C-alpha cells in the first residue's frame, strides 16, 4: 500500500485486514495505537493502528490515498485539524461549529469528519461526577482544544463560561462563535490582566493551555491562590506529566482535580465506535485506560488480582474459581483476619468495634504487597478508607465486581454472618449502602466487571 510510505519507523510492515491510523506532524510520540490496538485485540478484530507523518502540503493527497486504499478510519491531530475539512465529503455539525476535525469515518465517496474531543471530555467529566448543566466555568487559555471545550460547555448547558487569555481577540472570537451557536450570551472573553473582573464564586476550572507540559513550567497564569481557590473542581487537559503545576495548586488548595488522560481515552473510544459501528463496554474501556496509564507512567503494581465490591458481588466465588484456573493462591481478607485474631468478623465487630476491624484490614493489605500470584478477595468495606484503596492498587490489578441490588439481596438474604445486614429491612440497607459505596469502589478499582449478567466463565474471561 502506498500510504504505508508515510508510516513512522516501526510501523512500515504492519499488516491487518483493516488499517486505522492517525495523520499528524510530529506524530512519533502518539499514544493512540495503545487505545485502538488494545480494543482490536480484545474484540478479536483484524485491525491495526498506524501513525502516519504527513506534511501540510501532502494532506489532501494522503486523505484521498487512504480512502482509495481502504483505510477504515483515521484520527487527525496537529497541525491538520482545520485544513483536513477541505478534503472531506461531509463534516458533522459539532465539528463545523468547533472548527476542527479529529476523526474521519468512511462514507460513500470519501470520509466524513467528526470531533470526538468534545464528547470525550464530557464523558471524562461525567465519570468524575462533574455535571455541566447550569455550571459556571472558567477556562484558562483560548488555544488548542479551547474551542472544543467551550462548545462542550455550551452544548451541555453551562450557565456561564469565562475564557481567560493573554490575547483577548482569540478568546473573543471563540466567545462570539459559541454565543452565536447558543443563541444567547453564555461565553465571555476576559483579558488576562482583567481576571479580577470575574465575580467571586465557585467554578469548574479547566486548564486549556500547554503550560505544564515541560519541566520548569509554572502556572498558566500568575493570578495567586485567591483566584485559584475559586475552583470547586479542576481539569487540566495535559496528561503527561500526570501532575502539572495547575494540578499541584489544586491539591494544595484541597480542590478535587484530574488530568486529561480520560479525555484522551474517551475521544479514542468514541472514534473506534464510529469506525466499527459498535459500543465498547465499560469493562473494556477500563482495560484500555489501564493500558494507557501503564504506557505513560509505567506499571506500578504487583501481579496479583484483587477483587473488591459490595457483599454478594461474587468476590469469593469468582476468586476461588479464578485462582484455580490460573494456579494462583486464593486469599480472602476476612478469613485472613479471622485467623490472625482467633475470632469471627461478627465477634470482632461486637467486642472491638468496626474502627478496630478497619485498621486490621489496612495492616493486612500492607502485608499482601509482598505476595505474588494471588487472587485476593476483600471485605466489602475495605476500600472505603482512602489509604486502603491506594494500597490495593500497589498489591495488584483491582477489579470492582458489580451486581444490582436484586441480585445481591437474593445472594445474601439467608446469610447470618454479615453484621451490616442485621436490621429490620436488609434490602433497603443494601440499596442505601450500594448507592453510598458505588462511587468509592469505582475510584478504588482499575477495572469494573459485572457479575449479574453472565456465567462464571464469562466473568473470569473479563478478568484475565
Model segments located where?
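ATP-dependent small-molecule kinase phosphotransfer cores
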Residues: 333-393, 418
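A glycine- and Lys/Arg-enriched "phosphate-lid" helix/loop adjacent to the NTP-binding pocket
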Residues: 394-438
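Phosphate/diphosphate ligand-binding glycine-rich loop within oxidoreductases
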Residues: 6-130, 241, 247, 253, ...
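Adenosine-phosphate binding glycine-rich loop
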Residues: 237-301
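Glycine-rich adenosine-cofactor-binding loop
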Residues: 24, 115, 125, 134-155, ...
Amino acid at each position: 500500500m502506498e500510504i504505508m510510505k508515510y508510516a513512522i519507523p516501526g510501523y512500515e510492515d504492519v499488516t491487518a485486514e483493516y488499517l486505522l491510523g492517525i495523520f499528524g506532524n510530529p506524530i512519533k510520540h502518539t499514544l493512540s495505537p495503545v487505545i485502538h490496538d488494545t480494543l482490536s485485540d480484545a474484540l478479536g478484530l483484524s485491525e491495526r493502528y498506524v501513525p502516519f507523518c504527513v506534511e501540510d502540503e501532502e494532506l489532501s493527497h494522503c486523505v484521498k490515498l487512504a480512502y482509495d486504499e481502504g483505510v477504515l478510519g483515521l484520527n487527525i491531530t496537529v497541525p491538520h485539524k482545520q485544513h483536513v475539512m477541505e478534503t472531506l465529503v461531509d463534516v458533522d455539525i459539532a465539528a463545523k461549529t468547533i472548527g476542527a476535525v479529529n476523526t474521519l469515518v468512511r462514507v460513500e465517496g470519501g470520509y466524513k469528519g467528526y470531533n470526538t474531543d468534545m464528547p470525550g471530555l464530557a464523558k471524562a467529566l461525567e465519570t468524575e461526577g462533574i455535571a455541566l448543566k447550569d455550571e459556571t466555568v472558567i477556562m484558562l487559555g483560548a488555544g488548542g482544544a479551547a474551542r472544543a471545550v467551550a462548545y462542550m460547555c455550551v452544548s451541555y448547558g453551562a450557565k456561564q463560561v469565562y475564557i481567560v487569555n493573554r490575547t483577548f481577540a482569540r478568546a473573543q472570537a471563540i466567545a462570539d462563535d459559541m454565543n452565536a451557536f447558543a443563541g444567547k450570551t453564555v461565553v465571555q472573553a476576559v483579558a488576562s490582566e482583567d481576571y479580577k473582573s470575574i465575580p467571586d464564586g465557585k467554578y469548574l476550572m479547566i486548564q486549556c493551555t500547554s503550560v505544564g507540559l515541560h519541566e520548569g513550567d509554572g502556572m498558566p497564569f500568575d493570578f495567586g491562590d485567591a483566584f485559584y481557590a475559586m475552583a470547586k473542581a479542576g481539569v487540566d487537559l495535559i496528561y503527561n506529566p500526570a501532575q502539572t503545576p495547575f494540578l499541584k495548586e489544586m491539591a494544595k488548595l484541597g480542590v478535587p482535580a484530574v488530568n486529561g488522560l480520560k479525555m484522551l481515552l474517551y475521544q479514542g473510544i468514541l472514534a473506534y465506535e464510529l469506525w466499527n459501528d459498535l459500543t465498547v463496554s465499560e469493562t473494556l474501556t477500563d482495560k484500555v485506560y489501564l493500558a494507557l496509564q501503564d504506557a505513560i507512567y509505567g506499571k506500578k503494581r504487583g501481579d496479583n488480582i484483587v477483587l473488591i465490591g459490595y457483599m454478594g458481588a461474587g468476590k469469593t466465588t469468582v476468586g476461588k474459581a479464578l485462582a484455580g484456573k490460573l494456579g494462583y493462591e486464593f486469599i480472602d481478607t476476612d478469613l485472613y483476619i479471622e485467623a490472625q485474631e482467633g475470632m469471627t468478623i461478627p465477634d470482632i465487630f461486637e467486642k472491638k468495634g468496626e474502627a478496630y476491624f478497619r485498621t486490621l484490614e489496612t495492616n493486612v493489605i500492607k502485608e499482601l504487597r509482598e505476595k505474588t500470584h494471588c487472587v485476593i478477595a476483600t471485605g466489602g468495606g475495605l476500600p472505603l478508607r482512602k489509604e486502603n484503596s491506594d494500597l490495593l492498587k500497589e498489591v495488584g490489578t483491582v477489579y470492582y465486581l458489580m451486581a444490582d441490588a436484586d441480585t445481591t439481596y437474593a445472594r445474601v438474604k439467608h446469610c447470618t454472618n454479615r453484621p451490616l445486614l442485621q436490621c429490620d429491612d436488609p434490602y433497603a440497607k443494601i440499596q442505601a449502602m450500594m448507592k453510598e459505596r458505588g462511587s468509592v469502589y469505582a475510584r478504588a478499582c482499575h477495572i469494573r466487571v459485572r457479575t449479574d449478567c453472565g456465567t462464571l466463565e464469562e466473568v473470569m474471561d473479563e478478568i484475565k
